Design a protein with these regions (language model features):
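Bacterial Sec-dependent N-terminal signal peptides
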Residues: 1-20
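N-terminal module-boundary/linker segments of secreted carbohydrate-active enzymes
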Residues: 20-47, 52
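Glycan-recognition surfaces
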Residues: 183-278
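Carbohydrate-binding surface patches
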Residues: 266-269, 274-276, 312-351
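C-terminal beta-strand-rich structural cap/linker in extracellular carbohydrate-active enzymes
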Residues: 367-385
Length: 385
């Protein structure tokens, strides 16, 4: 049966791929409520985020999505329609407000009966919920596995292959429901990388898929997730992206150099850039990271190639990403606890000593290295061949 499901999904893939590319030609950029607000998020917070995206210059930099994560749901009405809770008195009005700013709005659910925060999920109401999202004017859906894992285990105890088949089918079901609405809605799969999702995510309509467990605002969490993306570059491209989770930049528990590493690595990975901080309370330092035009251009490069690891020696890693104009983005990462010098491996990258170099975080430095890379830090370069 699993083989039959995959065969049918692959037959439909050309159509799905075309629709996916239109929605997500480059990785999504925007904001998500979870990392800062968690289940406390309100209508007021979302409106404030939309205002801040415009006022701060983030909209002009490409941050378009304003995404509500978990905890917006109330119960269902007598007809089975999902109803927002009291924190969100009028979801259509909220969507209209976000759209009036020239932005897009996203929402969250689960294929299970409950979300991770124990709010109402979409289980057995997929078509109904998709229609409601479209009626409200939603442009993005994050679909989080959560309690559907219990459904899988109960239906097929000890049979992991069957459980994964059910997971694929659950995501495919919502994808078809979204397509049936006629509204272009970005479909974000959140299932923590299970069953090598990068191999099957496109066939169930995913525009992006989480490759690991949730990120936390710590260097250990961020770096373990980010550097674990090595080897996944061939699975990403226009319309379908590996997602190492949302940004923690500006949430305050990492150092400046660590946030530079975070932003640099996510850009090389062509990852979705979804800010997760309180946008109404951003420091100048946080803005300088999130609004850096060069790092955003690396992430959003229209070639659509995810970067990958070039070398790893002890705590030192070098990653590169090809760009459409022939340039190469290169990150020199120091995962160690002391500042150390690092150099460009010119020959390994197909470069010469005459290659022109732009230092993204230190534009006044036009040298060819070596560079002193701080503890947990990065030197991010754009190199012209």
């Amino acid at each position: 049966m699993r083989k039959t499901f995959l065969t049918l999904a692959l037959l439909a893939f050309p159509f799905a791929a075309n629709a996916q590319t239109k929605v997500a030609a480059t990785p999504a950029m925007g904001w998500n409520s979870w990392n800062h607000f968690a289940t406390r998020v309100t209508d007021k917070d979302v409106r404030a985020a939309a205002d801040a995206i415009v006022a701060s210059g983030m909209k002009d930099a490409g941050y378009i999505y304003v995404n509500i994560d978990d905890a917006w749901q109330g119960k269902r009405d007598a007809s089975g329609n999902i109803v927002p809770n009291s924190k969100f008195p009028d979801m259509k009005a909220l969507a209209d407000y976000v759209h009036s700013k020239g932005l897009k709005i996203g929402i969250y659910s689960s294929p299970g009966p409950q979300t991770c925060g124990r709010y109402e999920g979409s289980y057995q109401h997929e078509e109904q919920d998709a229609k409601m999202y479209a009626q409200w004017g939603m442009d993005y859906l994050k679909y989080d596995l959560c309690s559907y894992g219990q459904i899988m285990r109960k239906a097929a105890p000890g049979d992991q292959a069957k459980q994964y088949e059910m997971m694929h089918a659950a995501y495919e079901k919502m994808h078809k429901a979204l397509l049936a609405t006629g509204r272009p809605i970005y479909f974000s799969l959140c299932q923590y990388g299970f069953d090598s999702v990068w191999k099957w995510g496109p066939t169930v309509g995913g525009n992006s898929w989480r490759t690991t467990d949730d990120i936390e605002d710590s260097y250990m969490s961020m770096s373990n997730i980010g550097f674990a993306q090595a080897g996944l570059s061939k699975y990403a491209g226009p319309g379908h992206w590996n997602d190492p989770d949302m940004l923690e930049v500006g949430n305050g528990k990492m150092k400046y150099n660590e946030y530079l590493t975070h932003m640099s690595l996510w850009a090389i990975l062509a990852a979705p850039l979804l800010a997760g901080n309180d946008l109404s309370q951003m420091s100048a330092e946080t803005k300088s990271i999130l609004l850096n035009k060069d790092v955003i251009a690396i992430d959003q490069d229209p070639l659509g190639r995810q970067g990958d690891r070039v070398s790893a020696e002890g705590p030192f890693e070098i990653w590169s990403k090809p760009l459409k104009n022939g340039d190469i983005a290169v990150g020199l990462f120091n995962r160690g606890h002391d500042a150390e010098q690092m150099s460009l491996p010119l020959q390994k990258l197909g470069l010469t000593s005459s290659s022109k170099i732009h230092n993204v975080w230190n534009p006044s430095d036009s040298g060819h290295g070596p560079w002193m890379v701080p503890e947990h830090g990065v030197v991010l370069l754009i190199v012209k061949k």
